[in-house]
């Protein structure tokens, strides 16, 4: 089954004591590739800084997982895997929001 593609404005799960975060306007590496009117997200896109209730500093997560079969050419000319609901960030978050009409690759 295809996973719903992620876009600017979509959210992450949070992790441990760190709160959920979102992908801000401008966080997409593919500003010309849109889904439901929002730029799509790929591997290497970053979420907004998210803090913790502990004294730990805020961190910024980077998408490290994407569709094994769907790639998009980003603004820098590099083809990257399309990010989907359930894909991971290097901080421990997962993507939890995504497009309602477009999916890509299989999410295990």
Located regions from the model:
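Intrinsically disordered, low-complexity proline/glycine-rich segments
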Residues: 1-108
């Amino acid at each position: 089954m295809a996973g719903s593609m992620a876009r600017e404005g979509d959210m992450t799960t949070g992790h441990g004591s760190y709160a959920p975060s979102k992908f801000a306007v401008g966080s997409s590496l593919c500003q010309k590739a849109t889904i439901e009117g929002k730029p799509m997200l790929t591997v290497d896109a970053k979420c907004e800084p998210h803090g913790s209730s502990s004294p730990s500093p805020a961190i910024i997560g980077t998408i490290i997982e994407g569709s094994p079969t769907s790639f998009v050419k980003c603004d820098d000319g590099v083809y990257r895997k399309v990010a989907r609901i359930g894909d991971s960030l290097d901080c421990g978050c997962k993507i939890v929001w995504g497009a309602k009409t477009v999916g890509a690759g299989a999410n295990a």
